[in-house]
Amino acid sequence: MLNDSVIDIAKQLINRRSVTPEDAGCQEAMCEFLGALGFDNETMVFEDTTNLWSRRGKEGPVFCFAGHTDVVPSGPEDAWKTPPFTATEVNGYLHGRGAADMKGSLAAMLVATREFVNQYPQHKGSIAYLITSDEEGPFINGTTRVIDTLEARNEKIDWCIVGEPSSTDEVGDIVKNGRRGSLTGDLVVKGVQGHVAYPHLAKNPVHSAMAALDELAKSHWDNGNDFFPPTSFQISNIHAGTGAGNVIPGELHVCFNFRFSTEVTDQILIERVTTILDAHELDYDIKWTFNGQPFLTDTGALLDATQGAIEAVKGTPTVLSTAGGTSDGRFIAPTGAQVIELGPVNATIHKIDECVKMADLEQLADMYFGILERLLAN
């Protein structure tokens, strides 16, 4: 694997059926590769999750590549044009589960690291890898646990690239320099179950909650800013009733989510929701799940190096964006690290027939190399 091309390395990783939280030996293969380049490998196993912290160098600044070896399930394998866990070349594309999200990125960074270390064996600072098998799952025992371990022993990350598929139309056209925060509420509005013919003997929680839910849906939470759109509120699930047409439900269950900007905090949103629910005199319970604060890298050496490396490879500048979902960058940014996301085109991620353009992986490796060179070359 050490001397293989980026395509061959990607194939070897895709061929491992690492459906979350399984790693299926991907990190072991990476350890062997990195160990041969002088990295010290540390495997951290938490519950059902395998994590890797691999570092070359003892001094700062520390450049870290964060990624994951787990993939989402393939869905019905007979719906794929090629077997999802057998990497297959088709008309210039590499097909297989994880090709774009994110085994292609892992392969590109491994090749970039090999070329950089060979060219600059006495490079400045340290290069590190933070790899988990828990990114596509509940994200409890993965990156967040590794960060806790590093912080407990005062190991600091200065710059971090997350290899998530950030690109839209061609590799490098979009760099994620931040992400919105995420907060989920699970609301139970209580009523009194009864017969629909005798509403005076019951209390319909659907009717009780309608005005409050309407107010929540129409509320203006903030105006956003130069980097983030306004905070959004979306109801994702709603359920009441037994399935019978003649029974007034006793409870209404509502699940909703905020994707929020740096203009508000999770606590501000919780307080505003509570105020609205209380104003409508609802009998309710609510459980909050905080999925991560928003983060933003708007200036700094990492962003400069990334923009310069992409333009050197593509000949055109990249575009900065904070759109999209959450990533493990949300666990790394609070440590003070500069964090960006750069990876392949995301058009087929989590889909049947996931694939990545093979030429894009070669260009991505060149971009990663350029970033390392700009940050750590002597």
UniProtKB/Swiss-Prot annotation:
GO terms for molecular function: acetylornithine deacetylase activity; cobalt ion binding; succinyl-diaminopimelate desuccinylase activity; zinc ion binding. Zn(2+) 1 binds at residues 68, 101, 164. Keywords: Amino-acid biosynthesis, Cobalt, Diaminopimelate biosynthesis, Hydrolase, Lysine biosynthesis, Metal-binding, Zinc. SUPFAM superfamilies: Bacterial exopeptidase dimerisation domain, Zn-dependent exopeptidases. GO terms for biological process: diaminopimelate biosynthetic process; L-arginine biosynthetic process; lysine biosynthetic process via diaminopimelate. Pathway: Amino-acid biosynthesis; L-lysine biosynthesis via DAP pathway; LL-2,6-diaminopimelate from (S)-tetrahydrodipicolinate (succinylase route): step 3/3. It comes from the Bacteria. It catalyses: N-succinyl-(2S,6S)-2,6-diaminopimelate + H2O = (2S,6S)-2,6-diaminopimelate + succinate. The active site is at residues 70, 135. Zn(2+) 2 binds at residues 101, 136, 350. Its EC number is 3.5.1.18. Its cofactor is Zn(2+); Co(2+). Binds 2 Zn(2+) or Co(2+) ions per subunit. It is an enzyme of class 3 (hydrolase). Belongs to the peptidase M20A family. DapE subfamily. Homodimer. Catalyzes the hydrolysis of N-succinyl-L,L-diaminopimelic acid (SDAP), forming succinate and LL-2,6-diaminopimelate (DAP), an intermediate involved in the bacterial biosynthesis of lysine and meso-diaminopimelic acid, an essential component of bacterial cell walls. This is Succinyl-diaminopimelate desuccinylase 2. It comes from Alteromonas mediterranea (strain DSM 17117 / CIP 110805 / LMG 28347 / Deep ecotype).
